[in-house]
Amino acid sequence: MTKKEMLYEGKGKKLFKTDDENLLISEFKDDLTAFNAEKRGNESGKGALNCRISTEIFHLLEKNGIKTHLVETISDTEQVVKKCKIVPIEVIVRNVATGSLTKRLGIKDGTVLPFALVEFCLKDDALGDPFINDEHCLILNLVQNEAQISEIKNMARKINSILTPFFDNKNLRLIDFKIELGLTKDNELVLADEISPDSCRFWDKFSNEKLDKDRFRQDLGNVKMAYEEVLKRILN
């Protein structure tokens, strides 16, 4: 497969065209961003760690019936993925209150939620990715219909139901995570983007030590070591 010109560059990845119009190459970057890219950094080797972690998790999800855009991983930092039309919604699943949820609703940090909370944000950097509800999704034509909203929520909850016990078995608490979904040329809804410490909050099951991008957000240090620890536990 031939890697051609760059199609898109985001905060954490670059997408390249290939000689197959239905496939792209996704290249994971070492860049770190937080607070809508107002804070920026770089951690050598982070892209390779996220690529490996996301590959392992996507394979786990595929085995459990979740369709994804991943075709194969071809290098330490590159995946071949199906070309998708990304649904312009960031889907957030929360098991424990922390971050923006505590600030918006006054819930005490660390509160275990009675059930997984699914939230939507509009994918729009200029607007600061505002939180939106089901009706906003319909009014803004972000989804095809109400049935697709239900499909998105059901997929998000199923992903959570697979990953939460998996990570618990690795002595990691899956606090929350965000996902992106896409539509293939056959209009099939698939999990796209990545699942990694860039897009999830992982706390150690016993100490609640943060092992994710919050180490960068909150200047806790040892970002790469935390990502390496997550990968080590996934593989063990």
Swiss-Prot record:
Coiled coil: none
The keyword Iron is annotated on this UniProt entry: no
Keywords of the record: ATP-binding, Ligase, Nucleotide-binding, Purine biosynthesis
GO molecular function (one): phosphoribosylaminoimidazolesuccinocarboxamide synthase activity
InterPro entries: SAICAR_synt/ADE2_N, SAICAR_synt_PurC, SAICAR_synth, SAICAR_synthetase, SAICAR_synthetase_CS
Pathway membership, UniProt: Purine metabolism; IMP biosynthesis via de novo pathway; 5-amino-1-(5-phospho-D-ribosyl)imidazole-4-carboxamide from 5-amino-1-(5-phospho-D-ribosyl)imidazole-4-carboxylate: step 1/2
E.C. numbers: 6.3.2.6
Homology family: Belongs to the SAICAR synthetase family.
HAMAP family: SAICAR_synth (MF_00137)
Name of the molecule in the record: Phosphoribosylaminoimidazole-succinocarboxamide synthase
